[in-house]
């Protein structure tokens, strides 16, 4: 059954001014931005977890290792929601939405509990769900995913009794968790189906850097490796993974991080255009012209200035969740603000902090800055002589310089950047 926090809900039968489905980073930001812009109607923020809205990045790192507690993850206090006239609905999943025939922007959302939520405007900040691994034994106790707080708690409860952990997937989540678990004393094997680590997000040089770094720190990282079956012990718990070549690797935990699938079910119910997410315009408005969509679930025009008009992208990052929600708030206020900016990302993998500025798609030149003395590594990406992105490992000054150059539509001379002793900020022109 749903539970409630924050401000009082509207009286039975009365509509909330805005129903935000998805108590995510974007959902929280959207509510806060609307209040900052002067939106004075009641807001309902609805999520399907039995928790107050919280930050997810630490789940695979500091929280898993016990370095931070639950309260440090919570976005806002209950008093904040009361003061901002926002009702939190927890532990509720919307299963259907019926539009108002006379006002397409309004309607009624129907929850799994049977409760109804009338609204005058609707926003979807529903994020994405883990892609499932379809193999024999994939549902055994000890097979876990890591997308939300309950997933993280399940993993944390399993860790003390485990010696060997297999992480399936060499992306951000998999490598963050693998590094954390290794630091907790576990024998960790990373199995990546593709030919390189973090293949969707970084270039070859950065991928090679992380492969070498994780192996040097004690992780067993295997590329182009596929699982045939997850094997149970006599009690039905995970005991090993069998690879397609027949090798068996011992494990008491199998953590799967092979990407996510955008949650488009409600959009499909509403008849919205869907294509690798919910299709929106530059103002975070869906194809019906009324529904607002923000965050990981949104397939949007590429926000990088100068991108081709027909180029679209779906971004999964805290930065995008926040900035896209701000644009969505403007749209709800009737102000025409386009989403434009330089995407940036980060990933903490043990003692390595990766920061990415820009999008490297279409690069034709790279400059590698490897300061082995100070443990810093950066790859700068250029297209037609113009810097377009950078991957920076333990090199925050490089990251900040590239972000500054990109945000001001300036360049960083490639020849000068090749000298690691030169501060990149001095080359911005």
Located regions from the model:
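Beta1-alpha1 glycine-rich phosphate/pyrophosphate-binding loop at the start
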Residues: 3-87, 180-201, 401
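FAD-site-proximal beta/loop scaffold in flavoenzymes
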Residues: 139-160, 237, 242, 246-327
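Mid-to-C-terminal Rossmann-like scaffold of FAD/NAD(P)H-dependent oxidoreductases
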Residues: 2-17, 23, 36, 297-398
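Residue-level detector of alpha-helix initiation sites
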Residues: 24-28, 50, 128-130, 150, ...
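Cofactor-binding loop segments of dinucleotide-utilizing enzymes, especially the Rossmann-like FAD-
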Residues: 23, 46-48, 148, 170, ...
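FAD-binding core/adjacent interface of flavoenzyme oxidoreductases
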Residues: 1-21, 74-166, 242-244, 255-257, ...
């Amino acid at each position: 059954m749903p539970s409630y926090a924050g401000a009082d809900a509207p009286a039975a039968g009365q509509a909330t001014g805005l129903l935000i489905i998805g108590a995510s980073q974007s959902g929280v930001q959207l509510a806060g931005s609307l209040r900052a812009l002067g939106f004075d109607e009641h807001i309902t923020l609805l999520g399907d977890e039995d928790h107050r809205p919280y930050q997810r990045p630490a789940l695979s790192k500091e929280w898993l290792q016990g370095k931070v507690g639950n309260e440090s993850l919570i976005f806002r206090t209950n008093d904040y929601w009361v003061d901002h006239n926002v009702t939190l609905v927890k532990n509720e999943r919307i299963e259907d939405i019926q539009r108002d025939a006379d006002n397409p922007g309004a309607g009624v959302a129907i929850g799994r509990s049977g409760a109804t939520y009338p609204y005058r405007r609707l926003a979807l900040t529903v994020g994405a769900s883990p892609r499932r691994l379809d193999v024999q034994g994939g549902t055994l106790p000890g097979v876990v995913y890591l997308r939300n707080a309950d997933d993280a708690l399940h993993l944390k409860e399993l860790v003390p009794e485990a010696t060997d952990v297999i992480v399936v997937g060499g992306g951000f989540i998999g490598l963050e968790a693998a590094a954390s678990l290794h630091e907790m004393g576990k024998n960790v094997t990373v199995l990546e189906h593709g030919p390189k680590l973090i293949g969707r997000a970084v270039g070859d040089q950065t991928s090679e850097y992380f492969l070498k770094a994780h192996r040097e720190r004690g992780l067993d990282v295997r590329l182009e490796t596929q699982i045939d079956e997850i094997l149970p012990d006599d009690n039905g718990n995970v005991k090993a993974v069998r690879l397609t070549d027949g090798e068996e690797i011992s494990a008491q935990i199998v953590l799967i991080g092979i990407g996510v699938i955008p949650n488009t079910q409600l959009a499909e119910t509403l008849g919205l255009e869907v294509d690798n997410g919910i299709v929106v315009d530059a103002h975070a408005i869906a194809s019906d012209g009324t529904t607002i969509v923000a965050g990981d679930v949104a397939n949007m025009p590429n926000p990088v200035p100068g991108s081709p008009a027909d180029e679209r992208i779906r971004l999964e990052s805290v930065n995008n969740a926040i900035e896209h929600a701000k644009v969505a708030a403007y749209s709800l206020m009737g102000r025409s603000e386009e989403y434009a900016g330089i995407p940036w990302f980060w990933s903490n993998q043990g003692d390595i902090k990766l920061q990415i500025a820009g999008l490297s798609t279409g690069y034709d030149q790279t400059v590698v800055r490897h300061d082995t003395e100070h443990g810093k590594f950066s790859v700068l990406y250029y297209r037609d002589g113009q810097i377009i992105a950078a991957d920076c490992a333990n090199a925050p000054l490089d990251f900040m310089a590239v972000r500054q150059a990109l945000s001001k539509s300036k360049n960083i001379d490639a020849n000068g950047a090749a000298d690691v002793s030169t501060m990149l900020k001095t080359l911005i022109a």
